Amino acid sequence: MPKRILQGVVVSDKQEKTIVVKVERRFTHPLLKKTVRRSKNYHAHDEAGTYKIGDTVSIEETKPISRLKRWIVLETAAKA
């Protein structure tokens, strides 16, 4: 099974070796036929601690690292 790759914005970097990434998705509501935005926070592993709040990053699904972390940071798409 291929690993999922998502792109989002760093919303928290207060934990050691962990960042929180907000990923936003858009879809058309089946009944209202209106575009709806939904977001979800993912805890991602950041070994070096180089990413800061506001950075746009790509994260990749991986094996569980801790209770909440199942994602690792691949690269920075844009700095804040």
From Swiss-Prot:
Disulfide bonds: none annotated. Part of the 30S ribosomal subunit. Pfam families: Ribosomal_S17. PROSITE patterns: RIBOSOMAL_S17. This is Small ribosomal subunit protein uS17. One of the primary rRNA binding proteins, it binds specifically to the 5'-end of 16S ribosomal RNA. Coiled coil: none annotated. GO terms for cellular component: cytosolic small ribosomal subunit. GO terms for biological process: translation. The gene is rpsQ. Keywords: Ribonucleoprotein, Ribosomal protein, RNA-binding, rRNA-binding. Belongs to the universal ribosomal protein uS17 family. InterPro entries: NA-bd_OB-fold, Ribosomal_uS17, Ribosomal_uS17_bact/chlr, Ribosomal_uS17_CS. GO terms for molecular function: rRNA binding; structural constituent of ribosome.
